Amino acid sequence: MPNAERILSSFPKVRPELPEAYRAIYAEHYRRNREGLSPASSLSQKMEAWMHRRVARDAAERKTPSRTLEIGAGNLNHVLYEPDSEIYDVVEALIELPEKSPRRHRIRHAYRTIDEIQNEKYDRIVSIAVFEHFCDLPVTVAKCGLLLASGGQMRIGIPSEGTILWRIGWGLTTGMEFRARHGLNYSVLMRHEHVNTAKEIEGVLRFFFRDVRREVLGLMPALSFYQFFECREPDFQRCQGVFDRTR
Protein backbone atom coordinates (compact mmCIF):
# COMPACT_ATOMS: atom_id res chain seq x y z
CA MET A 1 0.00 0.00 0.00
CA PRO A 2 2.64 2.53 -1.10
CA ASN A 3 0.23 5.47 -1.53
CA ALA A 4 -1.11 5.08 2.01
CA GLU A 5 2.43 4.79 3.37
CA ARG A 6 3.38 7.97 1.52
CA ILE A 7 0.41 9.82 3.00
CA LEU A 8 1.16 8.55 6.50
CA SER A 9 4.79 9.66 6.20
CA SER A 10 3.59 13.27 5.89
CA PHE A 11 2.35 13.21 9.50
CA PRO A 12 2.60 14.77 11.99
CA LYS A 13 2.21 18.08 10.22
CA VAL A 14 3.12 21.56 11.43
CA ARG A 15 0.31 24.10 11.35
CA PRO A 16 1.30 27.31 9.51
CA GLU A 17 1.56 30.34 11.77
CA LEU A 18 -0.99 33.11 11.33
CA PRO A 19 0.31 36.62 10.64
CA GLU A 20 -0.45 39.18 13.33
CA ALA A 21 -3.29 40.80 11.37
CA TYR A 22 -5.10 37.46 11.30
CA ARG A 23 -4.43 36.64 14.94
CA ALA A 24 -5.99 39.95 15.94
CA ILE A 25 -9.37 39.05 14.42
CA TYR A 26 -9.25 35.26 14.74
CA ALA A 27 -11.34 34.82 17.90
CA GLU A 28 -14.15 37.07 16.66
CA HIS A 29 -14.17 35.45 13.21
CA TYR A 30 -14.24 31.99 14.81
CA ARG A 31 -17.21 32.94 16.99
CA ARG A 32 -19.19 34.44 14.10
CA ASN A 33 -18.44 31.44 11.93
CA ARG A 34 -19.47 28.95 14.63
CA GLU A 35 -22.73 30.76 15.32
CA GLY A 36 -23.61 31.46 11.69
CA LEU A 37 -23.83 35.19 12.31
CA SER A 38 -22.88 36.28 8.79
CA PRO A 39 -24.67 35.53 5.50
CA ALA A 40 -21.76 33.39 4.27
CA SER A 41 -21.42 31.36 7.46
CA SER A 42 -25.19 30.91 7.61
CA LEU A 43 -25.15 29.55 4.04
CA SER A 44 -22.22 27.33 4.94
CA GLN A 45 -24.15 25.83 7.85
CA LYS A 46 -27.07 25.05 5.54
CA MET A 47 -24.70 23.26 3.16
CA GLU A 48 -23.05 21.40 6.04
CA ALA A 49 -26.44 19.98 7.01
CA TRP A 50 -25.84 17.39 4.29
CA MET A 51 -22.94 16.00 6.31
CA HIS A 52 -24.94 16.00 9.55
CA ARG A 53 -27.80 14.10 7.93
CA ARG A 54 -25.51 11.49 6.37
CA VAL A 55 -23.64 10.92 9.62
CA ALA A 56 -26.85 10.56 11.67
CA ARG A 57 -28.74 8.47 9.13
CA ASP A 58 -27.87 5.10 10.67
CA ALA A 59 -28.97 6.17 14.16
CA ALA A 60 -32.55 6.68 13.03
CA GLU A 61 -32.57 3.15 11.62
CA ARG A 62 -31.19 1.43 14.73
CA LYS A 63 -33.66 -0.65 16.70
CA THR A 64 -31.61 -0.59 19.90
CA PRO A 65 -29.96 2.34 21.75
CA SER A 66 -26.33 2.96 20.85
CA ARG A 67 -23.16 4.17 22.53
CA THR A 68 -21.87 7.13 20.53
CA LEU A 69 -18.70 9.24 20.65
CA GLU A 70 -18.45 12.50 18.71
CA ILE A 71 -15.02 13.91 17.85
CA GLY A 72 -14.82 17.72 17.72
CA ALA A 73 -18.33 18.35 19.00
CA GLY A 74 -18.09 22.14 19.35
CA ASN A 75 -21.27 23.53 20.91
CA LEU A 76 -23.16 20.28 20.24
CA ASN A 77 -24.87 21.29 17.00
CA HIS A 78 -24.81 17.74 15.69
CA VAL A 79 -26.90 16.26 18.51
CA LEU A 80 -29.91 18.04 16.95
CA TYR A 81 -29.70 15.46 14.16
CA GLU A 82 -29.33 12.47 16.47
CA PRO A 83 -32.04 10.51 18.29
CA ASP A 84 -31.49 9.91 21.98
CA SER A 85 -28.60 7.51 22.60
CA GLU A 86 -27.94 5.18 25.48
CA ILE A 87 -24.64 7.03 25.84
CA TYR A 88 -23.40 10.10 23.95
CA ASP A 89 -19.87 11.26 24.81
CA VAL A 90 -17.93 14.03 23.08
CA VAL A 91 -14.35 15.17 22.55
CA GLU A 92 -13.79 18.92 22.22
CA ALA A 93 -10.53 20.77 22.83
CA LEU A 94 -12.48 23.95 23.70
CA ILE A 95 -14.29 22.17 26.51
CA GLU A 96 -16.28 25.28 27.44
CA LEU A 97 -18.26 24.97 24.18
CA PRO A 98 -20.09 21.74 25.04
CA GLU A 99 -20.18 22.55 28.74
CA LYS A 100 -22.04 25.82 28.10
CA SER A 101 -24.26 24.47 25.32
CA PRO A 102 -28.03 24.44 25.92
CA ARG A 103 -27.83 20.83 24.71
CA ARG A 104 -25.40 19.77 27.46
CA HIS A 105 -28.06 17.49 28.99
CA ARG A 106 -27.91 15.30 25.88
CA ILE A 107 -24.37 14.11 26.58
CA ARG A 108 -22.76 12.03 29.31
CA HIS A 109 -19.06 12.97 29.31
CA ALA A 110 -17.11 15.77 27.60
CA TYR A 111 -13.37 15.14 27.11
CA ARG A 112 -10.70 17.61 26.03
CA THR A 113 -8.75 14.97 24.12
CA ILE A 114 -9.43 11.47 22.89
CA ASP A 115 -6.49 10.26 24.99
CA GLU A 116 -8.54 10.88 28.14
CA ILE A 117 -10.95 8.08 27.20
CA GLN A 118 -10.14 4.83 28.96
CA ASN A 119 -11.97 1.50 29.23
CA GLU A 120 -14.78 2.52 26.87
CA LYS A 121 -16.17 0.95 23.70
CA TYR A 122 -18.55 2.70 21.31
CA ASP A 123 -20.97 1.41 18.68
CA ARG A 124 -20.59 4.63 16.71
CA ILE A 125 -17.88 7.26 16.43
CA VAL A 126 -18.96 10.35 14.51
CA SER A 127 -17.32 13.58 13.40
CA ILE A 128 -18.35 16.47 11.15
CA ALA A 129 -15.89 18.87 9.50
CA VAL A 130 -13.10 18.12 11.96
CA PHE A 131 -10.57 15.66 10.48
CA GLU A 132 -9.23 18.28 8.07
CA HIS A 133 -7.89 20.19 11.10
CA PHE A 134 -5.81 17.47 12.82
CA CYS A 135 -2.03 17.74 12.40
CA ASP A 136 -1.57 14.16 13.63
CA LEU A 137 -4.65 12.60 12.05
CA PRO A 138 -3.36 8.97 11.96
CA VAL A 139 -3.10 8.91 15.75
CA THR A 140 -6.71 10.07 16.13
CA VAL A 141 -8.02 7.58 13.56
CA ALA A 142 -6.04 4.73 15.11
CA LYS A 143 -7.44 5.57 18.55
CA CYS A 144 -10.96 5.63 17.09
CA GLY A 145 -10.39 2.16 15.67
CA LEU A 146 -9.40 0.86 19.09
CA LEU A 147 -12.44 2.47 20.74
CA LEU A 148 -14.98 0.81 18.43
CA ALA A 149 -17.02 -2.09 19.76
CA SER A 150 -17.35 -5.25 17.69
CA GLY A 151 -19.52 -4.44 14.67
CA GLY A 152 -19.16 -0.71 15.31
CA GLN A 153 -18.59 1.98 12.73
CA MET A 154 -16.99 5.39 12.36
CA ARG A 155 -18.99 7.93 10.35
CA ILE A 156 -17.39 11.20 9.32
CA GLY A 157 -18.20 14.16 7.11
CA ILE A 158 -15.49 16.40 5.67
CA PRO A 159 -15.22 19.27 3.20
CA SER A 160 -13.67 18.33 -0.14
CA GLU A 161 -10.51 20.24 0.71
CA GLY A 162 -8.01 20.19 -2.14
CA THR A 163 -10.63 20.11 -4.92
CA ILE A 164 -11.47 22.91 -7.34
CA LEU A 165 -15.19 22.98 -6.49
CA TRP A 166 -14.48 23.41 -2.77
CA ARG A 167 -11.97 26.18 -3.53
CA ILE A 168 -14.45 28.02 -5.75
CA GLY A 169 -17.23 27.51 -3.21
CA TRP A 170 -15.55 29.21 -0.27
CA GLY A 171 -13.78 31.72 -2.50
CA LEU A 172 -17.09 33.13 -3.77
CA THR A 173 -18.78 33.15 -0.35
CA THR A 174 -16.76 33.22 2.87
CA GLY A 175 -13.63 34.39 1.07
CA MET A 176 -15.31 37.45 -0.46
CA GLU A 177 -17.10 38.27 2.78
CA PHE A 178 -13.85 37.96 4.77
CA ARG A 179 -11.99 40.29 2.42
CA ALA A 180 -14.82 42.84 2.50
CA ARG A 181 -14.96 42.75 6.30
CA HIS A 182 -11.25 42.59 7.16
CA GLY A 183 -9.36 43.44 3.96
CA LEU A 184 -7.46 40.15 4.22
CA ASN A 185 -6.98 37.07 2.05
CA TYR A 186 -9.09 34.20 3.40
CA SER A 187 -6.79 31.57 1.86
CA VAL A 188 -4.18 32.37 4.53
CA LEU A 189 -6.66 31.44 7.24
CA MET A 190 -7.74 28.32 5.36
CA ARG A 191 -4.14 27.08 5.10
CA HIS A 192 -3.84 27.54 8.85
CA GLU A 193 -7.10 25.71 9.60
CA HIS A 194 -7.27 22.95 6.98
CA VAL A 195 -3.97 21.09 7.14
CA ASN A 196 -5.34 17.91 5.50
CA THR A 197 -6.90 17.44 2.08
CA ALA A 198 -9.87 15.15 1.49
CA LYS A 199 -7.58 12.77 -0.41
CA GLU A 200 -5.17 12.56 2.52
CA ILE A 201 -8.02 11.91 4.95
CA GLU A 202 -9.36 9.16 2.72
CA GLY A 203 -5.90 7.57 2.58
CA VAL A 204 -5.62 7.50 6.37
CA LEU A 205 -9.11 6.03 6.76
CA ARG A 206 -8.44 3.27 4.23
CA PHE A 207 -5.14 2.40 5.92
CA PHE A 208 -6.77 1.76 9.30
CA PHE A 209 -10.16 0.38 8.20
CA ARG A 210 -10.80 -2.61 5.93
CA ASP A 211 -14.30 -1.49 4.87
CA VAL A 212 -14.64 2.17 3.82
CA ARG A 213 -17.61 3.50 1.85
CA ARG A 214 -18.00 7.02 0.52
CA GLU A 215 -20.76 9.37 -0.65
CA VAL A 216 -20.26 12.87 -2.05
CA LEU A 217 -22.25 16.06 -2.39
CA GLY A 218 -21.35 16.63 -6.01
CA LEU A 219 -20.66 14.75 -9.21
CA MET A 220 -17.60 12.82 -8.00
CA PRO A 221 -14.94 13.19 -5.27
CA ALA A 222 -12.87 15.58 -7.40
CA LEU A 223 -15.96 17.69 -8.15
CA SER A 224 -17.73 17.86 -4.81
CA PHE A 225 -18.35 20.17 -1.88
CA TYR A 226 -18.48 17.58 0.89
CA GLN A 227 -17.74 13.90 1.42
CA PHE A 228 -19.11 11.31 3.82
CA PHE A 229 -17.26 8.16 4.90
CA GLU A 230 -18.63 5.08 6.65
CA CYS A 231 -15.74 3.06 8.11
CA ARG A 232 -16.03 -0.49 9.48
CA GLU A 233 -13.72 -3.33 10.45
CA PRO A 234 -10.71 -1.51 11.90
CA ASP A 235 -7.34 -3.21 11.47
CA PHE A 236 -6.50 -3.50 15.16
CA GLN A 237 -2.89 -4.48 14.48
CA ARG A 238 -2.30 -1.29 12.50
CA CYS A 239 -4.22 0.82 15.01
CA GLN A 240 -2.26 -0.54 17.97
CA GLY A 241 0.99 -0.31 16.02
CA VAL A 242 0.73 3.49 15.97
CA PHE A 243 0.96 3.58 19.76
CA ASP A 244 3.52 0.77 20.07
CA ARG A 245 5.94 2.79 17.91
CA THR A 246 5.68 5.80 20.22
CA ARG A 247 6.54 3.92 23.39
What are these regions (language model features)?
Residues P2-E28, R32-Q45, A49, I114, ...:
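S-adenosyl-L-methionine-dependent methyltransferase catalytic module, highlighting the catalytic core
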Residues R53-W166, F228-F236:
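Conserved SAM-binding loop
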